[in-house]
Amino acid sequence: MTKTDPAPMAPPPRGEEEEEEEEDEPVPEAPSPTQERRQKPVVHPSAPAPLPKDYAFTFFDPNDPACQEILFDPQTTIPELFAIVRQWVPQVQHKIDVIGNEILRRGCHVNDRDGLTDMTLLHYACKAGAHGVGDPAAAVRLSQQLLALGADVTLRSRWTNMNALHYAAYFDVPDLVRVLLKGARPRVVNSTCSDFNHGSALHIAASSLCLGAAKCLLEHGANPALRNRKGQVPAEVVPDPMDMSLDKAEAALVAKELRTLLEEAVPLSCALPKVTLPNYDNVPGNLMLSALGLRLGDRVLLDGQKTGTLRFCGTTEFASGQWVGVELDEPEGKNDGSVGGVRYFICPPKQGLFASVSKISKAVDAPPSSVTSTPRTPRMDFSRVTGKGRREHKGKKKTPSSPSLGSLQQRDGAKAEVGDQVLVAGQKQGIVRFYGKTDFAPGYWYGIELDQPTGKHDGSVFGVRYFTCPPRHGVFAPASRIQRIGGSTDSPGDSVGAKKVHQVTMTQPKRTFTTVRTPKDIASENSISRLLFCCWFPWMLRAEMQS
């Protein structure tokens, strides 16, 4: 369905920081193409986009012969051409230079505004440089033509309070940033925008993960220590990689690179914590833990509130410095042990959390009431249990028997042996099939065959088989997550034990993605996701900017 523009609305009053400019004069219709260009800019009234009769599509396609007739027809008015430019589709945005030239041929002043969006041709040109939807080359051609005719870089849209440089930074078009700043006044590069907490173009590029635009702005003298209304420098508005979903691996890498770039650009005199803090990147994680009296597998307290098990300590790809990875007892975390496509440890979803080393402390767990710490006893007959926690076999010694292949050696902290019935996380019942070290995480792990198909695998993880069970019946758990509820279900003659295929020590995080795309590809995705920014109605434009 073809969307049409609503009745013209008066744009909001100008903000305090908008540059002084000549008064715009409303004009009812566009002048004839043969008329000379006006001396003063005007605001053109809103009009619907023209379409050919019996046209099959809902958008204007400049490549279609019928649409070309309308585009080059002298009777097509400037407001109608502005309505075409507003359509956020590749067919239109790739021809921004052609459409813009037609607008100029009709006598349009270089600083004329679209009455619906309050945007000038230069604003539209910068928006049309977005990768994926627009064409940077076509946008640069039109921008150079407009600047040569005297287009004002400082003009702002009264709906978004953004100038042309802000649009170029938001849509990550470094070529346009260079064109706009060439010959512009020095204060333009650090001009702020109220819709981005009075941040500069560098703040806008940082918050939108526009690495190319940020580099270009720094090359042209953008101030990396300028603070917005919240007191943040550009490095502090870069999205946190740990808050990104697992399918945003490339974006997390861009966020890390962008933050590092902006931090290194900040002068040392600026009181930015990340710059002034010492760098522990080269300190091994085990030394850091030893200094704190901790080791992997210890129970820890995070921020004095959340308890969990320490699973990782070391440097990461998502941020500089030393980080600890904790498997929380409850699903109150943010990940499953991986961030930005890089796996550091394994835990159930929403139970993994990364934090700085200073935020953890050793937790003292109360001894569990249902599991005692006494040595393992022979298989129990529950018919002879006389009371809670009291059994008639007390004091009896375990009768030696020939161990099966699946039996375990006595280890500190072991609560069950192969063949024992256990309860996992207080919910799932199963039988222990494996106990020992694994390749996928440090420490000792129990491999359990669950009674119901609520597991995650068939006894193998990352190509290493630890035991055999039906698909989706296998699960691994640390000792703190299991509780023995019965004796062994295997007879002494059982010959199937869990045999590990091979032993390797995992020293590097394992990536869960195979390809890394360029920042330009990422910018394309970001541009596609910004369609709402350029929707048809100005109140939706403003809502997008405020979000």
From Swiss-Prot:
Modified residues (Phosphoserine): 401
Domain CAP-Gly: 314-356, 436-478
Cross-referenced InterPro entries: Ankyrin_rpt (IPR002110), Ankyrin_rpt-contain_sf (IPR036770), CAP-Gly_dom_sf (IPR036859), CAP-Gly_domain (IPR000938)
Gene Ontology process terms (BP): cytoplasmic microtubule organization; fat cell differentiation; membrane biogenesis; negative regulation of microtubule polymerization; peptidyl-L-cysteine S-palmitoylation; positive regulation of apoptotic process; positive regulation of D-glucose transmembrane transport; positive regulation of endocytosis
Record's keyword terms, sorted: ANK repeat, Cell membrane, Cytoplasm, Golgi apparatus, Lipoprotein, Membrane, Palmitate, Phosphoprotein, Repeat
Post-translational modification: Palmitoylation by ZDHHC17 regulates association with the plasma membrane.
Biased composition (Polar residues): 400-410
Modification Phosphothreonine, positions: 374
Compartment(s) of residence: Cell membrane; Cytoplasm; Golgi apparatus, Golgi stack
A GO cellular-component term linked to this record: microtubule plus-end
Comp. bias regions, Acidic residues: 16-27
Regions of compositional bias (Basic residues) in chain numbering: 387-399
Topology relative to the membrane: Lipid-anchor
PROSITE patterns with a match to the protein in the record: ANK_REP_REGION (PS50297), ANK_REPEAT (PS50088), CAP_GLY_1 (PS00845), CAP_GLY_2 (PS50245)
Region (GoLD): 488-547
Molecular function as annotated in GO: ganglioside binding; microtubule binding; microtubule plus-end binding
Keyword Cytoplasm in annotation: yes
Matches recorded under SUPFAM superfamilies: Ankyrin repeat (SSF48403), Cap-Gly domain (SSF74924)
Principal location: membrane
One Pfam assignment: CAP_GLY
Positions annotated as ANK repeat: 117-158, 160-191, 197-229
Subunit structure: Homodimer. Interacts with AKT1 and AKT2; when AKT1 and AKT2 are phosphorylated and activated, affinity is higher for AKT2. Interacts with ZDHHC13 (via ANK repeats). Interacts with ZDHHC17 (via ANK repeats).
UniProt domain comment: Microtubule association is inhibited by the ANK repeats and the Golgi localization region (GoLD).
Role noted for this protein: Functions as a cytoplasmic linker protein. Involved in TGN-endosome dynamics. May modulate the cellular compartmentalization of AKT kinase family and promote its cell membrane localization, thereby playing a role in glucose transport in adipocytes.
Misc note: The N-terminal half is dispensable for proper Golgi targeting, whereas the GoLD region is required.
Protein name as annotated: CAP-Gly domain-containing linker protein 3
